[in-house]
């Protein structure tokens, strides 16, 4: 998978926009990041739950690894682009997008 392939999947999510922070592209829904492309041009990140992350690490250990530190422990998952396939990334990206949408609904219920 290429950076453009990753970008295309991210932007196919309803309401997704491309923005940037810390010098690299990110993808947002409801103002919240659900995926990013890393500076190294070799990897991206999808924001999964820890449980979802474990599923993807178990099913596709060559494609997905936890991000470093607390981000990884919270579910942020690195996608190794040259090992990734469109179907698996699409599934992970959809979950990351849904997580962002669900978190937005929870925030709205609290206000």
Segments the model singles out, each with a brief description of its role:
Residues 1-111:
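Charge-dense, helix-prone N-terminal extensions
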């Amino acid at each position: 998978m290429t950076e453009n392939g990753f970008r295309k999947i991210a932007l196919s999510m309803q309401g997704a926009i491309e923005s940037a922070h810390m010098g690299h592209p990110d993808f947002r829904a409801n103002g919240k990041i659900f995926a990013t492309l890393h500076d190294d041009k070799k990897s991206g990140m999808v924001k999964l739950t820890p449980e979802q992350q474990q599923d993807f690490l178990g099913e596709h250990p060559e494609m997905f690894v936890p991000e470093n530190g607390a981000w990884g422990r919270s579910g942020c998952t690195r996608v190794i682009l040259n090992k990734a396939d469109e179907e698996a990334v699409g599934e992970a990206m959809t979950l990351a997008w849904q997580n962002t949408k669900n978190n937005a609904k929870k925030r709205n219920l609290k206000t």
